Amino acid sequence: CEETGLCLGRKVEKPVKLDGAWKPFADAGLLPDPSSLFLIARAITPPGRVRRFDTRFFTADASSIAHRVEGVIHADAELVELVWVEIGSQPLADAHAMTKNVLAELDRRLATGPLRHDAAVPFFHFYGGKMQKDVLGA
């Protein structure tokens, strides 16, 4: 819920008390449930950058959204807009190259049938000054 206002969770019978980033879940009568998330790729930004990231990219079906928190996305937030677009569509033309790589991987996986938790995952990283793609779990 924190960055997008979209909560992936499951309803609970009895209210629970959760604090911090988990509070929106409790307020909505939910417990966090990552079972609908599918790991699509991992990427580490190249050395020498001021800010480096070791990122895991996940996807979930929109039907997994159990609650929406209003007011999370606005001009002063990390995300100023949340939109749904088709993979390969024009709004993604200016996306970062790694984002395009990950979306292409998602598109390939969707083309083979339903997503699976045991699928091999590409790992993009730099080695010897070059971008390398290893496959984890293959």
Where are these regions (language model features)?
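Nudix hydrolase/Nudix homology domain
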Residues: L18-A138
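Conserved Nudix-box catalytic region and its N-terminal flanking loop in Nudix hydrolases
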Residues: C1-A21, L92
